[in-house]
Regions:
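Short, intrinsically disordered, charge-balanced linker/junction segments flanking boundaries
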Residues: 1-4, 161-168
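C-terminal helical cap/extension that packs against the catalytic core
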Residues: 110-165
């Protein structure tokens, strides 16, 4: 409908969020909601907790929390970080969630994590599941091509991070 939503300013990065916004606009228009009200809602929406949530943004460091627990979500979060900080070094800290998910998607997790500059994996969080022999965070780590990768116990993570020059 013409120039509807020209120059809309969004607070959420990433192609996946743009697709979500496009769908929300389409539904709003179909429901007869005015452009003003749709724009106001979208421009004020800050996202949800633990989905590309900026925890800290300083001159030299940025901390973003994202509870991506599926390879496609993880890839989308990494691509969003790259779009926000294209020339910055991005370190990802990933804790696999569930033995079955790790087993079923290990290759896809490894491929997504390879998009980072450096990765630290911590121990798998089993939630409600019993351990599956041979499945751990190392299952993903061993499939990764990335050279800058490590496994660190969660209890040692802060000390390990203090030794690094962090960026994103």
């Amino acid at each position: 409908k013409g120039n509807l939503f020209n120059e809309l300013k969004l607070r959420l990065p990433g192609r996946h969020n743009l697709q979500n916004v496009t769908a929300a606009i389409r539904i709003g228009v179909e429901l007869g909601i005015t452009e003003f009200d749709i724009r106001k809602a979208l421009e004020s929406f800050q996202g949800i907790v633990r989905r590309f949530e900026w925890i800290f943004e300083g001159k030299n460091q940025v901390y973003i929390d994202d509870y991506a627990h599926h390879p496609e979500e993880l890839k989308a979060a990494i691509e969003a970080a790259r779009s926000c900080y294209p020339d910055r070094r991005i370190l990802g800290i990933f804790q696999p969630h569930l033995y079955t998910r790790t087993r079923d998607f290990a290759q896809d997790f490894a491929k997504a994590l390879d998009l980072l500059d450096e990765v630290i994996l911590v121990e798998l969080y089993p939630a409600r599941e019993e351990a599956i022999p041979g499945i751990s965070s190392h299952t993903i780590l061993d499939l990764m091509d990335l050279k800058q990768k490590a496994y660190v116990l969660k209890k040692d993570l802060i000390e390990q991070l203090k030794l690094k020059k962090l960026d994103i």
